[in-house]
């Protein structure tokens, strides 16, 4: 809507290639003409897309945490009454404690939702022991972070590995890697599942199917 399909396609390809230097250069060039005007149009488009997503989910109870490109401010300003922002929170579901720690793994892109490993570690510490840990990005396991389309390793949380091995939650749920080499892995005694709804097969995870 703002930059056109050709420019966006180039950005996507550079991201797939992990060519962060050229991607950053291209991104900067897109704001040269009138930075303030372009930024305003971009923000309007971002708000509109959040609103469209929340409108589509209006009949469901939604728990949300930020990902690598998400803004807490925009989420909270656009989310509907059925949405609960649960980052850094623990909720009780039936007999289980479910913890949520959002944010994206830091990259050279420096997207608005990325946080430092130190900040992410503090989120995990705040949660303590839970039965299910929910994050945006996966633990740092090669098979879980490798994208089979680009044949490149994406991002994973090393502090999440430590948390899983120390606290031993029953499940680790995450997304972020869109075409993972493995969508399931066992780390210690914890079952790690990529639950992203992206595989073009209309499948999604029903929590009740795992816990009865």
Question: Could you say what each language-model-derived stretch is?
Answer:
Residues 2-6, 65-75, 91, 106-109, ...:
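Active-site environment of divalent metal-dependent phosphoester hydrolases
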Residues 90-95, 112, 162-166, 179-212:
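Binuclear metal-dependent phosphoesterase catalytic core
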Residues 94-132, 150-161:
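Binuclear metal-dependent hydrolase catalytic cores centered on His/Asp/Glu-rich metal-binding motifs
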Residues 130-149:
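Active-site rim beta-loop-alpha module in soluble metabolic enzymes
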Residues 74-82, 150-161, 185-199:
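Short, electropositive alpha-helical surface patch
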Residues 1, 130, 157-177:
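Proline-aspartate-enriched helix->loop->beta-strand connector
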Residues 62-67, 98, 172, 192:
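Hydrophobic/aromatic residues located in beta-strands of well-ordered beta-sheets
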Residues 1-93, 165-166, 195:
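Core catalytic region of metal-dependent phosphoesterases/phosphodiesterases
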């Amino acid at each position: 809507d703002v930059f056109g399909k050709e420019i966006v396609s180039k950005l996507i390809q550079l991201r797939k290639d992990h060519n962060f230097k050229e991607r950053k250069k291209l991104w900067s060039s897109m704001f040269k003409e009138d930075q303030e005007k372009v930024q305003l149009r971009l923000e309007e488009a971002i708000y509109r897309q959040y609103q469209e997503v929340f409108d589509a989910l209006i009949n469901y109870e939604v728990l949300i945490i930020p990902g690598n490109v998400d803004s807490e401010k925009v989420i909270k300003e656009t989310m509907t009454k059925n949405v609960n922002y649960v980052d850094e929170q623990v909720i009780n579901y039936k007999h289980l404690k479910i913890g949520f720690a959002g944010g994206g793994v830091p990259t050279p892109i420096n997207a608005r939702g990325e946080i430092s490993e130190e900040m992410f570690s503090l989120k995990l510490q705040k949660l303590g022991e839970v039965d299910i840990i929910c994050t945006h990005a996966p633990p740092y396991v090669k098979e879980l972070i490798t994208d089979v389309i680009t044949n490149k390793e994406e991002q994973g949380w090393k502090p999440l590995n430590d948390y899983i091995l120390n606290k031993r939650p029953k499940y680790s749920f995450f997304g972020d890697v869109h075409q993972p080499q493995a969508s399931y892995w066992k780390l210690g005694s914890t079952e790690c599942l990529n639950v992203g709804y992206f595989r073009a097969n209309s499948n999604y995870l029903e929590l009740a199917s795992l816990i009865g």
